[in-house]
Every structure is written in structure tokens, then in C-alpha cells.
Amino acid sequence: MAAEQIINGPPPAVDGVAAAELGSLTRLKFMIVRGFLWGWARCFSLKGLYLFGQAFGLLEWLVNHKRRRKFQENLRQIFGPALERGECPNIRSACLRHFMRLRCDKLLYLIFDKLPREKILRRVKFHNREILDAALARNKGVYVCMSHNGSHHVLILLMALLGYRVAGVRDRNEGALRRYVQERYEETFPEMRGIRMFFADTYPRALYRCFEEGYILGTALDVGRDRGAHLKTATVQMFGEEKRFLTGTMQIALRCGAPILQGFVVSRKNFYFRLIVKEPLVDPDQEADEPAILQQAMQKYADNIAEHVARYPCHISKS
């Protein structure tokens, strides 16, 4: 979820205007795919579906040279000089694991709504949940800084099913499959209808409202491309190189006095997930929209990403 100027996007149920435009042929195609995957899972269990996803990912890795090269270039761009110093994992191995991890996550995403709620939640291990709950207890909402690592579409569903009021940011040009699956989720899980989603190119008034109403707002600040000179950024050090990350949403959180945390989602074997919450990036009792505090928080955000990417290079989202 990459965002900087955000707001006034309607909740998912209202956003159904775009989803309603899906053609009947497109819907039929998605129904057939979902039916096949669910039938496979019923016959061979979720473990069987996971093995199918790994085989599918391996095949993609073998034949999709363009995407494989793009992922490897992304890794080189992220690690920079650290590659030459041998401070990062084997790129070839990370690329293969990325293809297999991503395909498995996508397969589960397609049939999540068909699984019993209890079965889903049993597959989630929440690390440092007490940090998030303590931040929410301050009644100022919570801003969770995300990054382009891991499957955020899985994360927001898990958080909603765990009972949290969550909000996020999405691109206006979402794919047809994502919109179709979103419809199915909203039909099955009432919690999904309470998720607030905003577009990434609109005015941020609603973000202030999210914090006032005690929501958990998550956006990613580590955008990989220039989104306009008018957007505020901060320069941070990451693997010995300078990176420019967006700062707008964090500044809004600072102005609202909302605790600022950082989160990651890690996909494990056989469709198990780890939700990881890091310590606050800013002392909640000293929050203020001051340049020094903002810069310190952004550098800590970058340091946490570097630590996470070094440990889970296959979780880079873009490939």
C-alpha cells in the first residue's frame, strides 16, 4: 500500500462501483479458477494446495526470464554495495523462493473466503501484539508503517478477522481479479465491510478522521519510483546507499499524536503466517511534527526494513 496524499476514498462496499463493471466472462473465468483451487484443496488438503503452489512457482521461475531478471535487479538495487561485501543472501536462491512464496500466497488469497474462520486464525502467529494493543489504548488511533515486503492483501484480512478496525491505501488501477475477490470476501466476512480503503492520489482529510476514530492505518512509505516533486520525502541510509522515502502519512500521524509502529507479514510453510510488530518509531509521549523527530523515525523505519529484507529477501513484493 504505497501512499502519500490520501483520502476520501469510500469503504470497500461503496467502492463496488468499479467491481460491478467486471464482465460476465471475466467473472466466469475467475469462478472456474477458484472452483478448481478449492476442489484441489478439498481433495488434497491445504498442504496439497501449498505443494501445488510451490510447483507452479518453480515452473514460473523456470520460464519467466523477464520477471526473474526484474526481481534480481530489484534485489541489487536494494542491497547496493552490500552485494559486493557479501552481506546479503544468494540472489538466485532468493529469487526462486520469491516465485514460490508469491504463488502460494496468491493461491490462498483466491480461496480465503471459503475457509472456516477458525482455520484461518489458527495459522496466524502474532508477534508483539501487546505493543499494538498498548498503542490502541491511547485512543488516538495507530499508524503502522508498512513496506513493499510480504503480502499486504493477506495481512489486512487477517487483521480484520482478529477484530481490529483497519484502514489502508490502494491504487485506483486495481486489477479485475483483486476486485472480484474483494467482493467475495465482503460477502463472507462482515469484518471486511468495515475496512476503510483510500485511493493513493486524493486529499488526506480522511486520514485525520481515521486516527480520531481509533483506526489502525497502514501505508507503505518505501516507494520505488518518483511520484511527483510535490510529495514530501526524507533521505535515509540503507545498505550504505541513500534512499528517498515518502513522509506525508507519518507527518499526519505525528500531528494527530497517533503512535507510530512498523509491521511486517511473513509467509511460512503450508500457509502459516507471522504478523510482526516492531517497537514504536517515535516515543508516544514526545510525538511532534518536527524535522529532527521525523528524520529519526524515517531512519529507524529504513533500518528495520534493511534488517527484515536481509532475513527475508524473498518477501520483496515487487518483481
Feature-to-residue mapping (PLM):
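Non-catalytic C-terminal accessory region of glycerolipid acyltransferases
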Residues: 2-4, 81, 161, 201-319
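Membrane-anchoring hydrophobic helices of lipid-metabolizing enzymes
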Residues: 2-146, 182-186
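Soluble or luminal CAZymes and related metallo-dependent hydrolases
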Residues: 32, 67, 124, 199, ...
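Active-site metal-coordination segments of metallo-dependent hydrolases
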Residues: 69, 171-175, 241-246
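Catalytic core of membrane glycerolipid acyltransferases/transacylases, capturing the structured
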Residues: 103, 109, 138-200, 227-234
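Short, flexible loop segments at the rims of nucleotide/cofactor-binding pockets, characterized by
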Residues: 118-124, 193-198, 238-240, 294
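Active-site glycine-rich loop that binds ribose-phosphate moieties when present
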Residues: 127-128, 198-202
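Contiguous, well-ordered alpha-helical segments that form the cores/surfaces of helical PPI scaffolds
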Residues: 130, 153-157, 250
